């Protein structure tokens, strides 16, 4: 793929219940990198970008929560509340969950369902970059809600990209002793800053044994989190966890990927292994509250600023693993 184009378009006009936002910042994301580098989920040509914040410049008929001039952040999805999965309370699996792409643009049309449920006004003291972290943090908040972490538990996070680092911070805030695994020194240093008690460079140590050796009698961790999107890391996480422990598989792998798991161990040692995808309005709201509190700081995640015409360079630098995230800043 590797073909991103900047084109002029008409500024959108909001329909009933819709809002138009003039973006101030857009953050790069691993999903953007997958779309750009190899194609992902959608058939090109299509819009790209889903982590942005900005100012309301137009509101449609019936909009009462927002007005022109409001500083806002809009998540990229909101569930339909009508499909089978929504009625079961599994909102992340909504079959009518449209992804509102197009954050790499000066203006963005926000659909009615998002305006009503997953769009927020920024407090006066909240930076646009801070607000733009709402979407990725909401995925980490939802992910960590799918495992039980008790005070004093030991949790390993495999992969210290943006989401992995957020998992580290959230596990630390839950009172866990956190172990971070990665091969990049600057990411491991940031992991320690965010709360990791131990860091393991997987190029220097065995990723399984080194983690187990940090637990009593090498029994394994209480919770192992996979945040790399590689099938071999799913298998590694399973082997890091103790009997009766939990494995959370967050990172999405390539289509039709399979993993090998010791079924005997899973059965007799009662290991729980769970996949998790996306987020829900409840967890989007929780993420925004955490950002307002300063539990996660944009300065730890957002490294370089680019102009919109340099979006490709921003994405390439992210895809190469040279930064945690980059930021597109728009002219007034």
PLM region spans:
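Glycine-rich beta-strand-centered segment in the early N-terminal region that forms part
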Residues: 12-26, 39-87, 121-125
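NAD(P)H dinucleotide-binding glycine-rich loop of Rossmann-like/cofactor-binding domains
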Residues: 80-158
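Mid-domain Rossmann-like dinucleotide-binding core that forms the NAD(H)/NADP(H) cofactor-binding site
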Residues: 126-205, 209
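Residues in the short beta-alpha loop(s) of Rossmann-like NAD(P)-binding domains
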Residues: 184, 253, 279
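C-terminal hydrophobic helical "lid"/dimerization subdomain
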Residues: 235-239, 281-332
């Amino acid at each position: 793929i590797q073909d991103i184009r900047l084109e002029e378009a008409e500024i959108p006009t909001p329909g009933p219940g819709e809002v138009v936002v003039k973006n101030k910042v857009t953050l790069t994301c691993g999903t953007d990198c997958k779309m750009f580098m190899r194609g992902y989920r959608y058939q090109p040509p299509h819009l790209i970008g889903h982590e942005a914040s900005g100012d309301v410049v137009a509101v449609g008929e019936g909009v009462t929560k927002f007005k022109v001039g409001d500083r806002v952040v809009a998540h990229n999805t909101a569930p339909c509340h009508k499909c089978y999965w929504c009625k079961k309370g599994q909102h992340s699996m909504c079959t009518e969950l449209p992804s509102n792409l197009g954050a790499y643009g000066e203006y963005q049309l926000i659909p009615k369902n998002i305006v009503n449920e997953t769009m927020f006004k920024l407090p006066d003291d909240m930076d646009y970059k801070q607000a733009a972290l709402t979407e990725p943090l909401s995925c980490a908040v939802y992910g960590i809600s799918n495992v039980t972490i008790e005070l004093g538990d030991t949790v390993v996070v495999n992969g210290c990209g943006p989401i992995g680092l957020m998992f580290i911070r959230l596990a630390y805030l839950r009172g866990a002793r956190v172990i971070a695994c990665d091969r990049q020194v600057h990411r491991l240093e940031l992991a320690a800053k965010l709360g990791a008690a131990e860091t393991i460079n997987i190029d220097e140590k065995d990723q399984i044994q080194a983690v187990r050796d940090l637990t009593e009698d090498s029994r394994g961790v209480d919770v192992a989190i996979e945040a790399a999107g590689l099938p071999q890391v799913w298998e590694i996480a399973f082997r890091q966890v103790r009997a009766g422990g939990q494995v959370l598989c967050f990172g999405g792998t390539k289509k039709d990927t399979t993993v090998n798991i010791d079924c005997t161990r899973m059965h007799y040692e009662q290991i729980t292994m769970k996949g998790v995808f996306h987020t829900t309005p409840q967890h989007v709201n929780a993420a925004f509250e955490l950002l307002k509190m300063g539990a996660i700081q944009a300065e730890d995640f957002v490294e370089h600023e680019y102009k919109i015409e340099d979006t490709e360079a921003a994405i390439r630098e992210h895809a190469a693993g040279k930064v945690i995230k980059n930021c597109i800043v728009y002219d007034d």
